[in-house]
């Protein structure tokens, strides 16, 4: 089916879409769809055109929230709103949950900082990148290493700093306090019990860094996400703001996101006028970054329509027959 023939007036390039894709694109604007299927069957393509379809049906572009697990996965959506004939007016917000958290913290900082342990909540926050977080962490941990910390392991110091931050990030995306880092690592360790001291030291360094951040209004990824989940998301003021500004959701590659993100969306989903959740049945490879396909699949229960795409655009018939 040719897009131009079926969607006259839409600002989209000519593209051959299948009937299942068109059905998803043209579904009523007030619907909750869970779209799943293997890679290469056109799920993201349908989602991008669904976004454009909503805009051209009169849905305000700024009321659309597009969520992806990593910014690199948002390329198709970002490119579609950069074309010269994109409908003038507002633009959809294309974010990760982490990006949304940072935006809300910046907007509601007095509310977020209150009762959150910051030494001076009147000062504005400073958001850290991975590089700046490692820089501050190195200043705290280097003296400890010189005093004998981590002496039983051989690892590049930058790699060690990265691992300590990763431990904090894992605690935030899964939803457990950083004070449990050591116990969880020891529980998963199958080697010599004497090595457990390394995990105690790693937790001590992580907590030292967290204290330093709270004293200086520095927010790394883990603190941003925890602050949003524990203090802003439960706030009626923040929830009302989000519900007022975003009435339509497109959430792509949900299987690559982490449990805390899924929990937030499951709570938020009933408030959206329309939502399209996209699940790749062949993915979920970023488990080392916190991806949880099992958690992602639970969102399906909150959707009205379940749609499966099966026909691949990238596999040859011969390869499909082998499978």
Over which residues does each language-model region extend?
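Hydrophobic residues on the short alpha-helix immediately C-terminal to a glycine-rich phosphate/catalytic loop
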Residues: 28, 50-54, 77, 268
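Conserved glycine(s) of the Walker
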Residues: 42-43
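Post-Walker A helix-loop "phosphate-sensing" segment adjacent to the P-loop in P-loop NTPases
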Residues: 53-62
């Amino acid at each position: 089916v040719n897009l131009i023939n079926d969607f006259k007036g839409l600002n989209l390039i000519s593209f051959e879409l299948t009937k299942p894709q068109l059905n998803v694109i043209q579904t009523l604007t007030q619907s909750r769809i869970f779209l799943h299927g293997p890679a290469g069957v056109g799920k993201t393509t349908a989602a991008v055109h669904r976004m454009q379809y909503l805009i051209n049906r009169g849905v305000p572009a700024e009321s659309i929230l597009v969520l992806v697990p990593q910014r690199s996965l948002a390329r198709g959506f970002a490119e579609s709103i950069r074309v010269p004939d994109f409908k003038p007016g507002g633009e959809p917000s294309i974010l990760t949950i982490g990006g949304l958290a940072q935006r809300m913290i910046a907007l509601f900082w007095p509310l977020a900082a209150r009762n959150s342990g910051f030494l001076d909540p009147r000062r504005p926050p400073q958001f850290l990148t991975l590089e700046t977080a490692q820089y501050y962490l190195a200043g705290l941990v280097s003296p400890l290493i010189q005093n004998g910390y981590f002496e039983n392991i051989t690892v590049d110091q930058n790699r060690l700093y990265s691992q300590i931050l990763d431990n904090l990030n894992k605690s935030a995306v899964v939803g457990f306090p950083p004070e449990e880092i050591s116990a969880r690592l020891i529980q998963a360790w199958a080697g010599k019990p004497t090595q457990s001291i390394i995990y105690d030291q790693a937790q001590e360094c992580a907590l030292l860094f967290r204290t330093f951040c709270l004293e200086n209004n520095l927010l790394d990824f883990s603190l941003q996400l925890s602050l949003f989940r524990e203090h802003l998301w439960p706030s009626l003021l923040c929830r009302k703001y989000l519900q007022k500004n975003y009435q339509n959701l497109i959430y792509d590659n949900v299987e690559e996101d982490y449990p805390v993100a899924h929990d937030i969306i499951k709570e938020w989903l009933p408030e959206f006028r329309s939502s399209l959740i996209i699940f790749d049945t062949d993915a979920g490879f970023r488990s080392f970054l916190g991806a949880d396909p099992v958690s992602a699949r639970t969102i399906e229960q909150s959707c009205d329509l379940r749609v499966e795409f099966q026909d691949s655009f990238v596999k040859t018939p011969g390869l499909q027959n082998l499978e």
